Amino acid sequence: YKNDKIEDVSQVYNGSRVIEGTESKHIDLIYSSDGIKKNILPNLTDPLANENFIFRNDQKSVLATYDPFANKIIRVNKTEAYGISPRNAEQSFALQILLDQRIQLVSLSGKAGTGKTLLALASALQSRKSYKQIFLARPIVPLSNRDLGFLPGDIQSKLDPYMQPLYDNLSVIRHQLKANTKRIRQINEMLEQEKLNITPL
């Protein structure tokens, strides 16, 4: 994993495109319908499965995604998962895809602190009834056995500092749910029953 290098960052798929100059009637149609055929949009070329778009002009804009199952461009609604709401377009796109049960694997990339883990955890909790167990994992590749040996305490004590960001995300969700004791109780029960398992990779 240390040897691969990206030669041209602009060639990396970032999951979304901004489509400028979209006619207002098409933006209104995306807003008012349950999806439109991709060929209705003349300035849209070769959408990829689950690719996200910001269609806009000088007056208005709409967030949308290409649904390969319906073969349509559909509106991305601002939604929430376990008390967590998206704060920008990218988080709205991520949450929509994470909550879509038809999509088996979602890969999120971005800078530290952009909400990737938080959104993934909130979406998993929101969809908990669809799964027997949720694993929240963090790779400890930078820690060799030699590094671990120099750290004080047992194995759990050695790993705790590296796992803390995952617990921090869970704390954020709990804080958002402070008025909803039922959901907080559900989280505690999932942890006790190991239905929510926070573990190193």
Name what the model sees in each region.
Residues 113-115:
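Conserved glycine(s) of the Walker
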Residues 101-107:
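Pre-Walker A (Motif I) flank of P-loop NTPase domains
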Residues 118-188:
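Conserved P-loop
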